[in-house]
Amino acid sequence: VMNLTAITDADEVTVKHFIDSLSCYDERFFFTGAKVLDLGTGAGFPGIPLAIMHDELKITFFDSLQKRLTFLKEVTTTLSYKHAEFLHGRAEEEAHKDIYREAFDIVTTRAVARLPVLVEWALPYVKTGGYFVALKGAAYAEEIEESKNALKILGGMVEVVEPKKLPGLEDKRAVLYIKKVKNSPVKYPRKPKVAVKNPL
């Protein structure tokens, strides 16, 4: 079995991966046939739970490690989920390809990086009028404040902040629904690792 997640206890997996992943599901955003990019999907969260919840979503699982995508191909085949696509590469590079740029109704992220970095990585993939959906932990309000400049530059607006509580857990978390209100400038995202070292 591939070591793709640090959480292995069945109850913890249920709460911390599946229920947490589904906390972002809202029919207002995840409409039938929506093209979804699960950026930095890892072991398939939130992408796999979303595919189970709504099998008419067209989800592209995106990761920099091929072994994770190989595993997810097996999972989606086992689930008979027919709309899966797989993208191997870096967020900062694939966004500059016409086939992916501003091509998705929704981009999801969970436990990938701080929000100013994610805004630069994710929004270039989102169609104008679409949404970047970020699952964030306790520091979400602070991260939103940190992201004001990045949002302005990349064309995003925080439309909904939905605080969440998971069963049996005391920690704060929230789902952020960030609307793409204008095109992202073509120079973004910047080259690999620049956003992390020097956030907007």
Where are the regions that the model predicts?
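S-adenosyl-L-methionine
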Residues: 62, 69-102
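Class I SAM-dependent transferase core
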Residues: 1-37, 67-84
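Conserved beta-strand signature within the Rossmann-like core of class I S-adenosyl-L-methionine
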Residues: 129-142
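Conserved SAM-binding loop of SAM-dependent methyltransferases across substrates and taxa
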Residues: 43-56
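SAM/dcSAM-binding transferase cores
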Residues: 145-200
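Short alpha-helix immediately C-terminal to the canonical SAM-binding loop
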Residues: 68-70, 140, 144
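Short beta-strand element of Class I
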Residues: 56-62
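Helix-to-beta-strand junctions that scaffold the AdoMet/dcAdoMet cofactor pocket
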Residues: 54, 126-128
